[in-house]
Structure formats: C-alpha cells, structure tokens
Amino acid sequence: MLKGIHPALSPELLKTLAEMGHGDEIVLADAHFPAHSLHKNVIRADGISIDILLEAITPLFEFDAYVDAPLLMMKAVEGDSLDPNVETRYLNAIESAVGFTPNLTCLERFDFYTRAKQAYAVVVSGEIAKYGNIIIKKGVTPIL
C-alpha cells in the first residue's frame, strides 16, 4: 500500500499509467465493452465505476494539450438512447479531481473501436452505463 494513491488504482494500472508516454491513450471501458477481442493489454477493474477511476487517475495524469479534445466518448447508435448523465458524471469526476475539464468529443461506435485498438491499454471497469466508455490521451508531464 502506498500513501496518497487512490485505492481504486491497482499495481497493474499504476504500472501502465507510468509506462505510457505522451500521446498514448488508455480506454476506460464499461463492463459490456469487447475489450479482449479488440486488445491484448486488458486490465480488470471489476466493480469500480468509471467516474471513480477518473477521480483516481486524473491527479496522476497530464492531459494532452496539443489536441483539440484529449477525451473521447462513444456516440449512441442512431435510434438508441444515451443517458446524458454519464458524460456529466465523468466530467464532474475530472473537475473534482483536478479542478478543470478538458475538451471532450464523441466518436461513432466503430470509429471508437478502431481507436481503442490503437490504445496503450484497455481498462474494463464495473461501469454498467450504456455507452459508458471513455478514452483519455496522455500529455507531456511537466518537469517538477
């Protein structure tokens, strides 16, 4: 156990976050996401919602400042419903953890899957909200 590290962060997830370089992306996926068929580097965070993971990760994580939107979510498929509270919950978690909210954009479902395949890792959470997936892009960590 380390002091100052959120208990939702497993050793495997901490190691992954530390290994990521600027421009790398990590997917925080809901419990329904086809992580194992899309990616070889899958980390389990069963029972932990994505807003809790965002609260835990974002204080340790610099968002990419060189892109328009370092946050990406999946658009609802036409004719399907999307709970707008999911996006709000995620942005509130980030705001609470770091004091600001980076820009967010949404991708079509299969574009999101393509992007997820290129990510550094996929974290499968206990999130049960439909379309509850988010990709976060790491930026350059400032030198202390």
From Swiss-Prot:
Name the pathway it acts in: Carbohydrate metabolism; L-fucose metabolism
Main localization is: cytoplasm
A single Gene Ontology biological process assigned to it is:
L-fucose metabolic process
**First-level EC class:** isomerase
Keyword flag Isomerase? yes
> Which Gene3D superfamilies is this protein grouped with?
RbsD-like domain
Pfam annotation, one family: RbsD_FucU
Q: Which residues form the active site?
A: H22 (proton donor)
GO molecular function annotation? fucose binding; L-fucose mutarotase activity; racemase and epimerase activity, acting on carbohydrates and derivatives
Keyword annotations of the record: Carbohydrate metabolism, Cytoplasm, Fucose metabolism, Isomerase
- Which cellular compartments is it found in? Cytoplasm
Give the residues the record marks as binding substrate. D30, R109, Y131, G132, N133
Q: Tell me which GO cellular component terms the UniProt record holds.
A: cytoplasm
Q: Which InterPro entries match?
A: L-fucose_mutarotase, RbsD-like_sf, RbsD/FucU_mutarotase, RbsD_FucU
Which reaction is the catalytic activity of this chain? alpha-L-fucose = beta-L-fucose
E.C. number, please? Answer: 5.1.3.29
Q: How does it assemble?
A: Homodecamer.
Task: Enumerate the PANTHER family for this protein.
Answer: FUCOSE MUTAROTASE (PTHR31690:SF4)
Tell me, in a sentence or two, what this protein's role is: Involved in the anomeric conversion of L-fucose.
The family line of this record is: Belongs to the RbsD / FucU family. FucU mutarotase subfamily.
Query: Any idea what this protein is called?
Result: L-fucose mutarotase
Tell me which species this is from: Haemophilus influenzae (strain ATCC 51907 / DSM 11121 / KW20 / Rd)
